[in-house]
Amino acid sequence: MEPNDSWRVDSEFRYTLFPIFYSIIFVLGVIANSYVLWVFARVYPSKKLNEIKIFMLNLTMADLLFLVTLPLWIIYYYHEGNWILPKFLCNLAGCFFFINTYCSVSFLAVITYNRFQAVTRPIKTAQATTRKRGISLSLIIWVAMVAAASYFFVLDSTNIELSKTGAGNLTRCFEHYEKGSMPVLIIHIFLVFSFFLVFLVILFCNLVIIRTLLTQSVQMQRNAEVKRRALWMVCTVLAVFIICFVPHHIVQLPWTLAELGFQSGNFHQAINDAHQITLCLLSTNCVLDPIIYCFLTKKFRKHLSEKFYSLRGSRKCSRVTTETGTEVVVPLSQVPVNSLKK
């Protein structure tokens, strides 16, 4: 493959930003999502998973798919945008990036709609058997996203660029668009408008949930706690969308136009810089998604609280020195209360 003209702009700060940021996301994301899977396996028998827990489990799997490719991107940006790995791994990384992004959007959307039904039609929702629907919707989402992402797996994903330092050529991964390519533009227009259509539906559902919860009279303290958690859940889902997905899709279309040669100069450089930042924000959904689970399931919160207090308790074990000078560990429950006061 011959090197192409170096007409495209570059944002060189990304070669420092992405390795650091993606490393943090990788560590936090793997820990958080692996813990979620462990809790699901330990607390919830597979046959007792209801619709929303099925969606949560699938969302976790989508996040882990993206996380396993982060080391590939870390290596890529560490080498200043030079893909030194086998070409098929570039295709795989791009494929999993697409699957994670739009599976996450889809599963957050159906989770929101599930909560919308629970608030607006509580009796009907409580009586409905939703396990089969959860499995069916999950299969539809996965099949649709994998089918769409297969395009990136067969695409010629790499291209050769001349290094700006003149030290040789760089192999780029998913960083080349043919000037004026209308198919590429149409695909991006479809993705961006589809996202904002889904976002508007989610925004509407969440606003209805908030209004309904705020207008309900609270007669018991327990109900007040349930309402508080429900409101936090709504705010968390909206925060994930606004922080992670909205900035990327706002920038995506003008960035595509600039990459295709419809815009140039200072605008192209500015929008390319902004695009790199939105890619970082997009990856944070892998860390933020597990927070939603804390507000959605009672058992998950209980298990997390028990582990947290268990760790605190083990750290607070009192060390008492006997008269003989031998140090022994005494459980906290057996230490007099007055001895713990400092």
Swiss-Prot record:
<feature type="topological domain" description="Extracellular">
    <location>
        <begin position="156"/>
        <end position="184"/>
    </location>
</feature>
<dbReference type="Pfam" id="PF00001">
    <property type="entry name" value="7tm_1"/>
</dbReference>
<feature type="topological domain" description="Extracellular">
    <location>
        <begin position="75"/>
        <end position="91"/>
    </location>
</feature>
<feature type="transmembrane region" description="Helical; Name=4">
    <location>
        <begin position="134"/>
        <end position="155"/>
    </location>
</feature>
<feature type="topological domain" description="Cytoplasmic">
    <location>
        <begin position="114"/>
        <end position="133"/>
    </location>
</feature>
<feature type="transmembrane region" description="Helical; Name=2">
    <location>
        <begin position="55"/>
        <end position="74"/>
    </location>
</feature>
<dbReference type="InterPro" id="IPR000276">
    <property type="entry name" value="GPCR_Rhodpsn"/>
</dbReference>
<comment type="similarity">
    <text>Belongs to the G-protein coupled receptor 1 family.</text>
</comment>
<comment type="function">
    <text>Receptor for platelet activating factor, a chemotactic phospholipid mediator that possesses potent inflammatory, smooth-muscle contractile and hypotensive activity. Seems to mediate its action via a G protein that activates a phosphatidylinositol-calcium second messenger system. May have a role in peri-implantation development during pregnancy.</text>
</comment>
<keyword id="KW-0297">G-protein coupled receptor</keyword>
<feature type="topological domain" description="Extracellular">
    <location>
        <begin position="255"/>
        <end position="276"/>
    </location>
</feature>
<feature type="transmembrane region" description="Helical; Name=1">
    <location>
        <begin position="17"/>
        <end position="38"/>
    </location>
</feature>
<feature type="transmembrane region" description="Helical; Name=3">
    <location>
        <begin position="92"/>
        <end position="113"/>
    </location>
</feature>
<keyword id="KW-0325">Glycoprotein</keyword>
<feature type="glycosylation site" description="N-linked (GlcNAc...) asparagine">
    <location>
        <position position="4"/>
    </location>
</feature>
<keyword id="KW-0675">Receptor</keyword>
<dbReference type="InterPro" id="IPR017452">
    <property type="entry name" value="GPCR_Rhodpsn_7TM"/>
</dbReference>
<keyword id="KW-1015">Disulfide bond</keyword>
<feature type="topological domain" description="Cytoplasmic">
    <location>
        <begin position="206"/>
        <end position="233"/>
    </location>
</feature>
<dbReference type="GO" id="GO:0016020">
    <property type="term" value="C:membrane"/>
</dbReference>
<dbReference type="GO" id="GO:0004992">
    <property type="term" value="F:platelet activating factor receptor activity"/>
</dbReference>
<keyword id="KW-1003">Cell membrane</keyword>
<keyword id="KW-0472">Membrane</keyword>
<dbReference type="GO" id="GO:0006935">
    <property type="term" value="P:chemotaxis"/>
</dbReference>
<feature type="topological domain" description="Cytoplasmic">
    <location>
        <begin position="39"/>
        <end position="54"/>
    </location>
</feature>
<keyword id="KW-0812">Transmembrane</keyword>
<dbReference type="GO" id="GO:0005886">
    <property type="term" value="C:plasma membrane"/>
</dbReference>
<dbReference type="GO" id="GO:0007186">
    <property type="term" value="P:G protein-coupled receptor signaling pathway"/>
</dbReference>
<dbReference type="InterPro" id="IPR002282">
    <property type="entry name" value="PAF_rcpt"/>
</dbReference>
<keyword id="KW-1133">Transmembrane helix</keyword>
<feature type="disulfide bond">
    <location>
        <begin position="90"/>
        <end position="173"/>
    </location>
</feature>
<dbReference type="GO" id="GO:0045028">
    <property type="term" value="F:G protein-coupled purinergic nucleotide receptor activity"/>
</dbReference>
<feature type="topological domain" description="Cytoplasmic">
    <location>
        <begin position="297"/>
        <end position="342"/>
    </location>
</feature>
<feature type="glycosylation site" description="N-linked (GlcNAc...) asparagine">
    <location>
        <position position="169"/>
    </location>
</feature>
<comment type="subunit">
    <text>Interacts with ARRB1.</text>
</comment>
<keyword id="KW-0145">Chemotaxis</keyword>
<protein>
    <recommendedName>
        <fullName>Platelet-activating factor receptor</fullName>
    </recommendedName>
</protein>
<feature type="transmembrane region" description="Helical; Name=6">
    <location>
        <begin position="234"/>
        <end position="254"/>
    </location>
</feature>
<feature type="transmembrane region" description="Helical; Name=5">
    <location>
        <begin position="185"/>
        <end position="205"/>
    </location>
</feature>
<keyword id="KW-0807">Transducer</keyword>
<feature type="topological domain" description="Extracellular">
    <location>
        <begin position="1"/>
        <end position="16"/>
    </location>
</feature>
<feature type="transmembrane region" description="Helical; Name=7">
    <location>
        <begin position="277"/>
        <end position="296"/>
    </location>
</feature>
